[in-house]
Amino acid sequence: MLLRSKPALPPPLMLLLLGPLGPLSPGALPRPAQAQDVVDLDFFTQEPLHLVSPSFLSVTIDANLATDPRFLILLGSPKLRTLARGLSPAYLRFGGTKTDFLIFDPKKESTFEERSYWQSQVNQDICKYGSIPPDVEEKLRLEWPYQEQLLLREHYQKKFKNSTYSRSSVDVLYTFANCSGLDLIFGLNALLRTADLQWNSSNAQLLLDYCSSKGYNISWELGNEPNSFLKKADIFINGSQLGEDFIQLHKLLRKSTFKNAKLYGPDVGQPRRKTAKMLKSFLKAGGEVIDSVTWHHYYLNGRTATKEDFLNPDVLDIFISSVQKVFQVVESTRPGKKVWLGETSSAYGGGAPLLSDTFAAGFMWLDKLGLSARMGIEVVMRQVFFGAGNYHLVDENFDPLPDYWLSLLFKKLVGTKVLMASVQGSKRRKLRVYLHCTNTDNPRYKEGDLTLYAINLHNVTKYLRLPYPFSNKQVDKYLLRPLGPHGLLSKSVQLNGLTLKMVDDQTLPPLMEKPLRPGSSLGLPAFSYSFFVIRNAKVAACI
């Protein structure tokens, strides 16, 4: 059923109490709402368009963090675990370019930092009380900026060297995922090859044997962006060969305690012509053995991206055609196979400095989540939760950035049933709206409630009017705006005017709603994004 708004009088003058944005100067009062700033919405709520995973919003740890395994110990931070736990349920993908340059060495000795970490965990519940010894944490955090530069330089120069990691490294990674309530997906090295370019599975077998001995519950991938192996390693692997490699890995898993483990792939890059061709031949050869098709997407080159790019609906819409291409390939080869966005962020190459870690990045992130759900992608994995570059959710001091808070709100408010919302009229692209059933795990809400999330790329406030019969319902507003003089480039965020920050290392803040007067329009300030929960909506598709 398509539900349309009924005309009503424009809302009265509203005071913007949350600080200036866009054309409004400090202390200026906004002008009264003009007719063109009142926007009517249409909802389709008769049945869900799609059903996404409860782990729809998931995260990654880049494999380059293990280049020097000492830095994996940073994952032992209780604060980092608290932040990760806030996003559960979710997958934690350990992957990235370095996946194909990491070799497991079960005989490798633990580093001093690793030994210190494990010794400090003796006789205590590591998930509750585990922490990094203060001297070790201080040392690693002092050295991290230099290590980060090394990793980024290696990435830019495309000169990758093999690194080894130990049993201890695997233990640290698994412990972080397990204590955080995340399901680990581990990327195996696909560039280990025999003389005739068959995949050499011997190192993977060593890792499987070790993880099996520990009773670890892990899902698996093989390789990262195989479409660029020639550029990265001077090795060309076609899609058919890669499909055979996945069949070989599938057989290995079936012979081990991982016989019921999930296998995902092939983690190709953006679906340009050659990559789409590779994906098609891979799916024909090996698509039967994978549980979901994975691919990667970035909007921009991190070294050339601008703030204007982050706010440009033309840039946001590029994602739509990429999704369509992937689904065309999948439906022509393995119809019905689930599609995941296995790695994604705003800009490749580690993100865009002074942009990918600011409030401005949220426009891309929220829009990508909305479009992905609407178009049928089951899981979206955000690059990265913590690590090198500028696109992380949590910074080098373990402090959450704006996209973390946006992700946390999404987790708490947005359910798995995807509905349809649209803006009436022709000028829709700068005001982007998405609709789901509300997350019923949220104790504040109940089955039948709706969550609308909206992005305003206009330089004026827009007033959203809900369609009948929702126009007179109680609505809770969760408006996110940047804090401080840097505006859209701020790394701090306010929710309904209150600054979001952790209470302490073990405690996330309450996410306080702002109840709106029933029947009022939903004000969305210039260059902002917000969630609106429509209470007592009693939508049958959500029950």
UniProtKB/Swiss-Prot annotation:
Membrane topology: Peripheral membrane protein
Impact reported for residue 533 to R: Abolishes processing, secretion and enzyme activity
Biological processes per GO annotation: angiogenesis involved in wound healing; cell-matrix adhesion; establishment of endothelial barrier; heparan sulfate proteoglycan catabolic process; heparin proteoglycan metabolic process; positive regulation of blood coagulation; positive regulation of hair follicle development; positive regulation of osteoblast proliferation
Known EC number: 3.2.1.166
Result after altering residue 539 to A: No effect on processing, secretion nor enzyme activity
Known outcome of mutating residue 156 to A/E: Alteration of the correct processing of heparanase which results in the cleavage at an upstream site in the linker peptide and no activation of proheparanase
Chain sites annotated for binding heparan sulfate group: 62-64, 97, 158-162, 270-280, 296, 303, 348-350, 389-391
Propeptide cleavage-removed residue intervals: 110-157
Mutagenesis / variant outcome for changing residue 158 to A: No association with GS-modified heparin
Enzyme class (EC, first level): hydrolase
Family assignment from sequence similarity: Belongs to the glycosyl hydrolase 79 family.
Assembly information from the UniProt record: Heterodimer; heterodimer formation between the 8 kDa and the 50 kDa subunits is required for enzyme activity. Interacts with TF; the interaction, inhibited by heparin, enhances the generation of activated factor X and activates coagulation. Interacts with HRG; the interaction is enhanced at acidic pH, partially inhibits binding of HPSE to cell surface receptors and modulates its enzymatic activity. Interacts with SDC1; the interaction enhances the shedding of SDC1. Interacts with HPSE2.
Listed name of the protein: Heparanase
Origin species: Homo sapiens
Phylogenetic classification of the source organism: Eukaryota, Metazoa, Chordata, Craniata, Vertebrata
